[in-house]
Amino acid sequence: MPKVPSLSVFFPEYNEEANVENMIREAQRILPEVAEKWEIIPVNDGSKDRTGEIIDRLAKADPNIHPVHHEKNKGYGGAVISGYNASKYDLVFFTDGDLQFDLREITLLIEKLDEGDLILGYRKNRRDAWNRKLNAFLWGSLVKLLFGFQVRDVDCAFKMIKRKVIDKVQLSAGGAMVSTELLARSSKAGFRFVEVGVTHLPRVAGTQTGAKLSVILRAFGELFKLYGKIKNQPK
């Protein structure tokens, strides 16, 4: 497979000292195989452990690593937005920093670039607890009802985005709703989606925060605000 000319990769990290070095090392191994130019943007979202220290140590040894640090925790959406806005190359890929995806499968998304503007992974066999699966099903059903676009896995953190999308679609959701906002605004703007099945792996270290009640309630509040903002917005 030919290499893409340039690729930015970012991933949020919050208290991921057990995963962050392996995540960055994996990106360092894979990106030179798929892109002529590339950058890694680890977004340290106000971690209280050694996550930021580890990121900075690795960045000192590799000029392709461009860290973003939040002094205070901004939430998942805030971290995604920081990586989204910091990216500089023609293609932008984001995933989570907890090693629950096989980064080698980025090639599956690259193969579909001619078919869409956003290449969206969906988890073929989601390896999460039942409550997270239930939350995802209910959330996805509500999103489809409100915004009308059909996507199998709205919140799958394995997405590739073309620069023209990033230049037009501005994000503001600070919480877990950021993927929904990206897709809703992109759909409204007329951009095309393509979906690709990807492998989902069990978390082996660190602690998930997405199923906390406070996170869920914030996401639902932001969802209805977004619906109110864009339902009558012209393309």
Where are the predicted features?
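Conserved donor nucleotide-binding strand/loop of the catalytic core
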Residues: 38-41, 52-86
